Amino acid sequence: MSDMSRSTIVIEAPMSKVSEVLFDLENYPEWSDSITKVKVSERDEGGRVTGATLTIAAGALKDEVSLSYNWDGAPERLEFELEDANMLTKMDGAYILKDLGDETEVTYELSVGVSMPIPQMMVTKQEKTTIDQALAQLKEHCEG
């Protein structure tokens, strides 16, 4: 995943709490300003979300995206991949968690493609802004 933007933050909460928040996709709108609605379309036999449609508003980017989720690396890793969208042609990423005892290191990787002619530099800048905002809001929610 070398073409992905990424950032890492340390959250002052145990991994069990951070993963509980991250894995509760339906409640993302409670803590993420850029995700305004989540509609679950599929779950696995364990009840985990494997497909969902998210309404996102990240800066100038507003779209409704259908994502598939891969839980093979859980609880240390949750991956997602774009299935369908209006503006986006790609939205692949992962949350990677590292247990530090009373704290958790969280890395968010994201790669986005758009259907409009936008310079890659601007797309990468928006990816980084989205990542940093998501990590800051996750930290605030988990520590608050």
Per-segment meaning from a language model:
Residues 1-47:
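Hydrophobic ligand-binding cavity/cleft-lining segments
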